[in-house]
Amino acid sequence: MSQSMFDIEIHSVNTDGKTNAPIARLILAHGAGAGKHHDFMQAMASQLTGHNIEVVLFNFPYMQTMMETGKRRPPDKAEKLLTHFAALIDEVAKTQTSVPTFIGGKSMGGRMATMVLDKAESIVGAIAFGYPFHPPGKPEKLRTAHLETLKKPLLILQGERDTFGTKDEVSAYALSSTIAVSYLTDGDHSFKPRKQSGFTLETHIECAAKSTADFIKAHVNK
């Protein structure tokens, strides 16, 4: 696989120093402002490999350019992001071992995963971590039209206080019957809860990884 084109990072399933066959693979896309090396992406990958799920992280081209130049830049338009995501999915299918494959992402990356999901024949389902239902403070600008007709299974893991879509807001949306939404108690867009809630970011990431693994296993075993 071309590292220069796709800038991938594979987290294999290891036990006692040996690489084991995963039960599934998750291709995970990053959010708008931070790439594959962000703490959330690395922590989630680490948790998921503990559930025997191989994780493929990558940077979109604009993020790869940011890493190389050290200069911040906005994400490319959705069309370009989706083209890259689809090409990466095809490349993984051609060059990696054949296991049930899922896609997902954090925030923007999760949205891109949901938009490519039904068009990607090799993909079983998707997981969105903190889906950006609308821009913060603009609940009228919904990004849900395609979610109303989604055919493949999707799990959305959302902080209850997420400013891109709170629990109260999301529960009122008309979403496809193939979509399941699970909430992290008192979590924000990064799943971080307030101290007085009694929860921690670490336990929420563990919980999100467990929910992801359960979702994947349920659809692998169908």
Go through each PLM region and give its residues.
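Serine-hydrolase catalytic machinery in alpha/beta-hydrolase-like enzymes
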Residues: 2-100, 188-195
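Short beta-strand immediately N-terminal to the catalytic nucleophile in serine-hydrolase-like folds
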Residues: 100-105, 129
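Gly/Ala-rich beta-loop-alpha elbow adjacent to hydrolase catalytic centers
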Residues: 105-109, 113
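Hydrolases whose catalytic domains are alpha/beta-hydrolase-1, hotdog thioesterase
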Residues: 112-116, 137
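A conserved short beta-strand
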Residues: 122-133
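Short beta-strand/loop motif that positions the catalytic acidic residue
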Residues: 150-151, 156-158
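Conserved alpha/beta-hydrolase "acid-adjacent" motif
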Residues: 163-168
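C-terminal catalytic histidine-bearing segment of alpha/beta-hydrolase fold enzymes
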Residues: 171, 175-222
